[in-house]
Amino acid sequence: MARPCFKLEKDHPLPLAGVDEAGCAPLAGPVVAAAVILDRGRFPRGIDDSKKLSLEAREALHGKLMRQARCGVGMASVEEIDALNIYWARMLAMVRAVEALGFDPAFVLVDGNRCPRWARPSKAIVSGDARCRSIAAASIIAKVTRDRIMAAHAGDFPGYGWEQNRGYPTPDHRRALRELGPTPLHRRSFGLVREVLAESAQPMLASAAE
């Protein structure tokens, strides 16, 4: 299958930033977005949708992109996710990622079907991380950044397996959540976390009634 290329980018003005995020589905941790401006004459080979790359390939490309491209990273915290909902938190992280570039790109391509509410010239591209090289590069920066954050927090909250599952709702994470309860990094607005919190409150409510 063909890798992402510049075909869908060539009709837009430069400098062009590709934007993508990582971490909408997890039960814990922030959502992280990245904005990347590639030098079309000098960029790492092998750029692809981060989901299609091995851990080793992502890490290697992350290092090369940080050296050879202009990269900005933005995040929305767990508190912001719970206050805004994941959709708007994702948009907020993208806005922050572009702002983190330090200057205004001439055009922005965003992965997905909708751009943030901003005045920037931009376009949303469905499956952009599989089609546009700049968005694919952003997917790598966002994914590796978020994975590192969750791996670092794994030592603070042992037992949840974040060094492996990165906060996603894997069977081991779901089991740990039920057995150990939520941490401050769990998203209270997400269904399973809400369910566990409600279950843990029931015995307390019963004893209070007695």
Labelled PLM ranges:
Residues 1-210:
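RNase H-like, Mg2+-dependent phosphodiesterase core
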